[in-house]
Amino acid sequence: MSQSRWSIVLIFALFIFGSTGVNAFFNFGHHQQQQQQQQQSYEDQVLNNPCDGYLCPDTLTCVAQQKDCPCPFPKSQLKCVLPDNKFVCISKPATHNEKFRAIYDDPVKGPKAKNKGFRDCGWVSDAYKNH
């Protein structure tokens, strides 16, 4: 066999066995034992939910009333209650000031805060009233 044929055979062998080895490595050898999790669609989750109150559309949390729904990302969002008992979730204001950060991280003080220069729930309330 000529040298070029050996090169082709060697490259082909490396490709076949190399890809199998890489696949086994990245799948940790469990490529045939993969488990497929069946995730329910959003519609199925809503329709099959046993909630007997109000089902929050963003979090699928069951609460007594719509105004009791939590924000989907409470660590980074403030829940601002509007005058008509509706609410809107906004991003917490970004600040390096520890005093303001403590206020906005507080679940009671944060939604009631109205600090000049920050787009917080006070700002949302003013914007809603002037709407």
Curated annotation (Swiss-Prot):
Offer a single GO CC term for the protein. fungal-type vacuole
The GO annotation for biological process reads: ERAD pathway
Q: Does the keyword Protein transport apply?
A: no
**Phenotype of the disruptant?**
Leads to long chronological lifespan.
**Domain of life of the organism encoding this protein:** Eukaryota
Per UniProt, the keywords (alphabetical) are: Signal
CDD domains cross-referenced by the UniProt entry: LCL2-like (cd23996)
* PANTHER family, per database record: LONG CHRONOLOGICAL LIFESPAN PROTEIN 2
Summarizing the function annotation, the protein's role is:
Probable component of the endoplasmic reticulum-associated degradation (ERAD) pathway that acts upstream of HRD3 and USA1.
What is the protein's given name? Long chronological lifespan protein 2
The source organism is Saccharomyces cerevisiae (strain ATCC 204508 / S288c)
Gene name, per UniProt, is: LCL2
